[in-house]
Amino acid sequence: MESSVERKYSPALNWTITEDNEARPAALHVILHKREYVFPWSRYIYADGGNDHVLIAFPTHEVVITGYGLDHLLVDLAAHRVKCLREASRADTFRAANEPEPKGAIMELVVREIEE
């Protein structure tokens, strides 16, 4: 039996999406601690995964994500609404007791170049 109490979540941690009234972004911006990538959505091939793991494929690179609530990220990727993915910082592992849980979070983010 489902609870009748609606659970409140804070926004996803380490990814940002467009609002409903905004245009879709032209590219996906991936921010790592020491490097940044910009992948045009026109070169997007597919995304695959589940709640704790997502792979995003482009012709030259793969973006590998681990975390939780990533099924929400897959929905946003399918709609091309994701503007930015950020590598997690140490502070992201802590939150105040009175803060609502994020709907999902990226805990590890890796970009791999595809070798031909």
What is the predicted function of each stretch?
Residues 14, 65-116:
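Helix-rich interaction surfaces within compact, conserved domain-sized segments
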Residues 50-61:
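Short acidic, Gly/Pro-enriched loop/turn segments at secondary-structure junctions
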Residues 45-47, 61-64, 71-72:
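Short, surface-exposed beta-strand-loop junctions and turns on beta-sheet-rich folds
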Residues 19-21, 36-37, 46:
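Short, conserved, surface-exposed binding loops centered on an aromatic residue
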Residues 1-22:
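Anionic N-terminal interaction surfaces
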